[in-house]
Every structure is written in structure tokens, then in C-alpha cells.
Amino acid sequence: MGKAVSVTGGVVVLALAYVGSSWWLGQQAEKHYQTDYDKIVKRMGFDEVKRVVYTRGIFESQAIDILTLVLPRPPQGMMGDDDQDDSGEDITLHLYLVQTIKHGPFVGGRLAAARIETRLDKVEGIPEGLKQALAKASAPTASTLVGFDGSMDGQAVLPAGEMVPPDSEPDNRMSWKQLTYDYRVSGDRLQVQDQLQWPELTWSVSPGAFGTDKPGMHLVMSGLSVNIQQTGTNPDYCLMVPGHYTTRLNDFQLKTVWNDGKKPFTLFSVSGWESQGRITSSGELLASEENGAGKAVVMDVPLEKLGYTASISNIDEAVLVPLQDIIQEMGKATDPDDAMPDEARLRPVVSTLAASSPALAMRLDGTLKGKTAYVDSRVVLNPLQGSASVPLGQQMLQTLKADVKVYLPKAITAEVNRRLEKTFGKDANGCNLDCQLRQQGIALEQADAWKAKVQFSGGQLMLNGQRIF
């Protein structure tokens, strides 16, 4: 009898310990997750977050938040014939987000503090035309496992779906395959690993949709993958975080299409694209470099190679947080007149940024038949000069220095001329690309190429050695 009581008592104690630990772990997981949740919501630009329901249980809790987002209204008719409100008023959306927190220490067969399931329950305020267009689209979901140290390991999913504008041609549609986004974040929020996979996105617009006698459009993107690994120094940084990343894209095509049997014209396509980037920190200054390459078609001209390199240097870490806030607020502005912050707020950020002479360099090149065309540019913002009474924009123009070089082989312009004439016929004035470059006088003509050089320094603009202003 005594042994039975002892065993029973032990079971009760263990059960109470599990219940107590589950409740405590649930609270700890909620605390860590809520902090990150608030930061993410802020970075995404929501105007208001309101918690309307919170139910805490021993083994499971649930929260319902309303996220308010104000968006500018699209041009009239963009969302279907039934949505003809041309009042110009912004669209206010209310997103109902449901979060279910399943407390540890055992959740879904794994040892963890909690698992948090997040889903978008409904959205209020969507114009009727857009609501009909999204009838075959499903809301995104996310599942996050919270470790005992506050680390997070999860996956967000956008299910496959399509968007079809109401009362439109059957070919007017956007469709996509399931997008997955895997993330892993350390307890101190400094180590981050992200992976995005999007197998396919297609978007078709029938000829005539953009206007009478206007061609339609067909866009295809397939095999997009992005991998990011970051080792940060401050969990509040999101604009530039030390680490490295790779991007791969199997295929991207943008074409115009016609109803009269005319062959589709490729505006731009790229295949086998792969790029790598790295962000580094010296302790005070940040820098980044990126390069990518693939095969491409530009204006129906197939290139043997499309290359891209870019670098940013001398970014003072002290400006990251205020600069992030300014960029975020500019992105939220629905009126262009309200997008730029006032000078009193912007000046200290720009002054600190300019003090280290930040520089941006970029090069884009394409090769055809062994000949390479390129655009090569470099911009430097030197320390501001003069007193604070001088307008900030004027000070920046005086210290900004920019150089842009363009080189275009005639072997490439000849191929462009041939392709354009084959697709659209000869220009009414008989003036092809070379002729237009010659008439405009922007580029200098050489025996086998066109060249142009633009320089800006001390508030003066030079084109090919000649002062413009």
C-alpha cells in the first residue's frame, strides 16, 4: 500500500512539474517571440497593431492581433469594373492575425519551449474587385519552434494560388507555386540563417489590356532560391548585417505578345543567374560587395553573358538605426509630398553618414560575339562643408562626386538594329539606334563603338568633357 501511494505521489509530482514547466516555458517563449514580433511588424510598415484577444492556458495560449496598413489607392479600374471609386482616398486594411502558442517542454514530438503557429485569418477593407481577384489565393502561414535559449527555428509558407481580375480576359492572370521561407535565429538574435525557395511565378496580360493596339505581356520567373547567413553585432540592425548570401534564378522572361500572330518580342530575360554577396564590418564601418552572372536576352538580342558587380563602402554603423527608421517611414508615405523627412531630422543622419565618405560603385556589362558593352559608375559623398544655415540639399550637391562611363560596341548596336527591324519593320524616318545616338549627341562616335562619360563634382555636371551646368 505504501509503495502504491509512493508511486502515485511521484506521478502526481511529475505531472505537476510538467504542468508548471509547460506554463512557465509558455510564458518565456511568448516573451521572446513577442519582442521579435513587435520589431518585425514595425519593420514591415504597419500603421497600428492592436491585440484584441489573448487567452492564456496551461498547455496552450492564443492571441489575435489586428494589424492596420494604409495603402495608396491604385489607379481607377485596376481592380475590376465594379471598383470604380476614384475618390483618391487611401485603402485601409485590417489584417487579423491568429497566433497559437503550444507550450513545451514537448511540442510536436520535439523538445522545445514552445511552438507558435501563425495564420492570417481574414483581411478587412479589401476593395471588392481585388477581393474577387484573390478568390483562388490562400493566406500565408508560419510555424516557429522556440528553443529553451530563446532561439527560433521555423518556416513561413505562401500556398500556391492565382489572381484573376474580375470581368477580364481569361488570359489575364497571375499564378504562383508554393513559396517557402525557412529561418533560424539564435537566442541573442545575432546569428541568422534564412532560405527562400520559390519554384515559379507567371503573369500574363492579354493584348489590348494596356490600351487599343497595345501588346500584351507575359512574365515568367522560375527556380528562385536565396540563402542568407548573418553574424550581426546588433540585433536592431536590418539594413546592413555582416554575413554572406547567394541568389540563384533558373529563368526569368519578360515578353510582349500580340494577337495578330506576330512573334513575341523578348524585352528582357536571364537564365542560369547566380550571384554572391558579402557584408563586412571593421567595428565602426560597414562595407558590402556583390557579383553575379548569367545568360541574357535584352531587346530580343541574345547575350553570351550578363555580368553585374556592386560595392558599398564606409558606412558608419551609427547611422543604421535612424536611417532604417527614415527609409521605413518614407516607404509608408502615401503622399509623395510627405515622403521626405524634415531637414532637422535628416541633417544629423546625413552629416554622420557623409563624415566617413561613403561610396557606391556599380558595373553592368553584356557580351555579344566577343564584344562587351558596359555601364561603370561610382558615387562618393564626401563630408559636408559649410554651416548648418546652408540648405542640406545644397551642401550635399557640393560634396557629392559621381563618375559614369558607358561603352557600347557597334557590333551590338548592329544586332539590335537587325532584331528591331525584323520585329517592327524599319523606322518611319529610317533612323536606327546608331542614327539616334548620332543625332542626340550624347555619345562620342568611334570607329567601332559609342562612348560616353558623365562627371559630377562641386555642383558641376560634365558630359564628355563639356560642362552642362
What are these regions (language model features)?
Residues V5-G9, L16-F469:
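Glycine-rich, small/hydroxylated-residue low-complexity segments
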Residues M1-G2:
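Short, low-complexity patches enriched in S/T/P/G
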